[in-house]
């Protein structure tokens, strides 16, 4: 079966884990190159041992590799600031490249596979939001398909040890991009995102809490929609699960909640508690936050590649 070649820009935790996933499980994709800026990085050393072409000279080095002309997909696992420069540079050389953006740059449309992948199959650049967004936006969208969502707030708690320099450099972009995507894809009128780097030792796996305030709705229908969505996410992130039963609170008109920017609102408050365990391909199992990003990005590119090969 013909496979499309990919390059991964960023040889840190996310880029290296993504490379391992493609090497082990790529169905329509195969590795073409791993790109970094640190010649001593573990990711580049590992890639070289596995027979993958490497460069420590960034996207300029990628463009000079003999196989650059055969690359169909580029995964960018650098930083938001770097991606804003990488996209026009690469597209200037190869206009037809597909870029999968794993930074919070959001040059292209947000993509959460279980919610809106099919709408984005032909996009030249898609943004994978953030780890917190990939974990929680499906839950907001699950409530949205049952009732109108006024407000959604998510809290993503990740092990401090799983947050590399790229994640730490993008904390502000994380909250901004996730909040916007909660609205754009999740369907909330207003979204808010909070990230917590948990320093506990031994490290704890990723935990996410989702609070949704919606119009009044049938609780059984909401719970069923959430369970169905969680199962869909498990299709590409097996370690994704509801940690406990969904909790509901009816907010009466007589005692509404005051939501900044929206005013006083009543309705149904839904609380969802998630945990995400990583597949431990390259990263430890507690780094579910990184695993859900690489898994979502791979699922997106695989579906795009399938569509391109079948065209």
Curated annotation (Swiss-Prot):
Catalytic activity, reaction form: acetaldehyde + NAD(+) + CoA = acetyl-CoA + NADH + H(+)
UniProt keyword Oxidoreductase, yes or no: yes
Enzyme class, first EC level, given as a word: oxidoreductase
Domain of life: Bacteria
Signal peptide: none
Residues annotated for NAD(+) binding in this entry: 11-14, 162-170, 289
InterPro entries, sorted: Acetaldehyde_dehydrogenase (IPR003361), Acetylaldehyde_DH_C (IPR015426), NAD(P)-bd_dom_sf (IPR036291), Semialdehyde_DH_NAD-bd (IPR000534)
Keywords, in A-Z order: Aromatic hydrocarbons catabolism, NAD, Oxidoreductase
Active-site annotation: 131
GO biological process, one term: catabolic process
GO molecular function annotation: acetaldehyde dehydrogenase (acetylating) activity; NAD binding
Xref: Pfam families: AcetDehyd-dimer, Semialdhyde_dh
EC number(s) on file: 1.2.1.10
Family recorded in the similarity comment: Belongs to the acetaldehyde dehydrogenase family.
Protein's name in the database: Acetaldehyde dehydrogenase 2
Organism phylogeny: Bacteria, Pseudomonadati, Pseudomonadota, Gammaproteobacteria, Pseudomonadales
Gene name of this polypeptide: mhpF
